[in-house]
Amino acid sequence: MVLNQNKNSNKAEYGGIVVSVFYLILFFLILNITIYFHKSTNFTVVVKNSVLTSFFVNLLLVCLQGIFRLKTCDGMRYEISKFNRYLKLGSVYAKPLVSFNQYQDQSATYRQKTSGFWWMNLIVYLVGSLVSGLVSLL
């Protein structure tokens, strides 16, 4: 799913890996910042609170990114919505750039192509958070 081929560029898309690495780096950054600014002298309490803070901040960002991705229109979704408007309204202005067969193919495979992105990032983030939390507690 990460190495999904794009018809326009014929290159592998590595967006999922890049975003997952970004979230892992962000996790460690927030972890270090919260440890640095914590006022307590008990190191284990500081680390536990920092891991929890970093985990929930990143989890919120992952959720927001997933919602944002579902709400935005990339090229394929835009063409599908144009075709739906064209079929409903019969408007010349909404006439899509794809044929009806292409529309059927794209609308049938669109969810399959984009559904793994959100879950893959979440799983990689959770595994990375677990590993970094365990390492920081040692």
UniProtKB/Swiss-Prot annotation:
It is a multi-pass membrane protein. The chain crosses the membrane at residues 17-37, 43-63, 117-137. NCBIfam families: MPN214 (NF045743). Keywords: Cell membrane, Membrane, Transmembrane, Transmembrane helix. One of its GO terms (cellular component) is plasma membrane. It is found in: Cell membrane. The keyword Transmembrane applies. This is Uncharacterized protein MG076. The keyword Cell membrane applies. Its main location: membrane.
